[in-house]
């Protein structure tokens, strides 16, 4: 009976992660398939660019909290040890990156990963936020910020003396870098999109205006 319950909830965590918020919001409220615009990604950043800030915030919140909810499934249903939260959270992240509803072509899983961290350890999540936000303000690029932050977060995980957390954080490094392959190529060519704030964005604008 426990095995059936575990398997059912495991699948639920994957399906939660697979829910394509960007595609659903785009099609229902804007009559657009977000995969055909901008970078073609279904996540928060492309939603902001293509559909605007309101849609972007909604998609971010859905992607974020589906990670949190999936991570808390073992707690909600009393499945056992706390480390199971890491496994269920990772399954949701993989669901976002490889959603069954979109033929396994999903997003970069940054927002869902953040939600997963909140669900597992609030203190660790706050440290991750302190790492991520200043780097974003400096680089003006969500992709570059994610690539830098995930490595620093992996290093920070060792200070929590939680081997399971460190292992999952290491897997996230691999997943985030893999899902950002096209972004890395654009960064190397100085062609990556920027958010409209931050040090690099302001310096670039200043340089452009001075020409």
UniProtKB/Swiss-Prot annotation:
Protein name: Glycerol-3-phosphate acyltransferase 2
Record lineage: Bacteria, Bacillati, Bacillota, Bacilli, Lactobacillales
Function noted in UniProt: Catalyzes the transfer of an acyl group from acyl-phosphate (acyl-PO(4)) to glycerol-3-phosphate (G3P) to form lysophosphatidic acid (LPA). This enzyme utilizes acyl-phosphate as fatty acyl donor, but not acyl-CoA or acyl-ACP.
Major location (coarse): membrane
UniProt subcellular location: Cell membrane
Family under the similarity heading: Belongs to the PlsY family.
Catalyzed reactions per annotation: an acyl phosphate + sn-glycerol 3-phosphate = a 1-acyl-sn-glycero-3-phosphate + phosphate
UniProt GO MF annotations: acyl-phosphate glycerol-3-phosphate acyltransferase activity
Native organism: Lactobacillus acidophilus (strain ATCC 700396 / NCK56 / N2 / NCFM)
Pathways per UniProt: Lipid metabolism; phospholipid metabolism
GO BP, one annotated term: phospholipid biosynthetic process
Bilayer-crossing regions: 6-26, 57-77, 82-102, 124-144, 148-168
One Pfam family matching this protein: G3P_acyltransf
Protein's membrane topology: Multi-pass membrane protein
